[in-house]
UniProtKB/Swiss-Prot annotation:
Oligomeric form and interacting partners: Interacts with protein M1. May interact with host nucleoporin RAB/HRB and exportin XPO1/CRM1.
UniProt keyword annotations, A-Z: Host nucleus, Host-virus interaction, Transport, Virion
Keyword S-adenosyl-L-methionine: no
Annotated protein name in UniProt: Nuclear export protein
General function of this protein: Mediates the nuclear export of encapsidated genomic RNAs (ribonucleoproteins, RNPs). Acts as an adapter between viral RNPs complexes and the nuclear export machinery of the cell. Possesses no intrinsic RNA-binding activity, but includes a C-terminal M1-binding domain. This domain is believed to allow recognition of RNPs bound to the protein M1.
Classification lineage: Viruses, Riboviria, Orthornavirae, Negarnaviricota, Polyploviricotina
Organism: Influenza A virus (strain A/Hong Kong/156/1997 H5N1 genotype Gs/Gd)
Entry's family note: Belongs to the influenza viruses NEP family.
Main location: virion
SUPFAM superfamilies in UniProt: Nonstructural protein ns2, Nep, M1-binding domain
Domain of life: Viruses
Misc note: Average number present in a viral particle is estimated to be 130-200 molecules.
Length: 121
């Protein structure tokens, strides 16, 4: 995994945790949780690609890995839409910058997961 991506995840999660969005703090906490889950999933796919012998054990352990992959792409799309929505409604420049960086990171992670999954297929 790229060290810049790791620091980007950590930076965005820190920034999001500092935001006060009033009544929508539950939504923000949900986004943070999904970001963390997405990072872990992307990392595990990357590790499986690096150890191609693990592909068979991954498939044996979890015959539904393609379903999980599809679910992760749905989560990414939801997060992208949520971040875009937040970006449109916020007037705070700190939040705008954070959400713009989060959007860029999501698009990068989506591409990485696609690349990893094609290598595993």
């Amino acid at each position: 995994m790229d060290s810049n991506t790791v620091s980007s995840f950590q930076d965005i999660l820190k920034r999001m945790s500092k935001m006060q969005l009033g009544s929508s703090s539950e939504d923000l906490n949900g986004m943070i949780t999904q970001f963390e889950s997405l990072k872990l999933y992307r990392d595990s796919l990357g590790e499986a690609v690096m150890r191609m012998g693990d592909l068979h054990s991954l498939q044996n352990r979890n015959g539904k890995w393609r379903e999980q992959l599809s679910q992760k792409f749905e989560e990414i799309r939801w997060l992208i839409e949520e971040v875009r929505h937040r970006l449109r409604i916020t007037e705070n420049s700190f939040e705008q910058i954070t959400f713009m960086q989060a959007l860029q990171l999501l698009l990068e992670v989506e591409q990485e997961i696609r690349t990893f999954s094609f290598q595993l297929i």
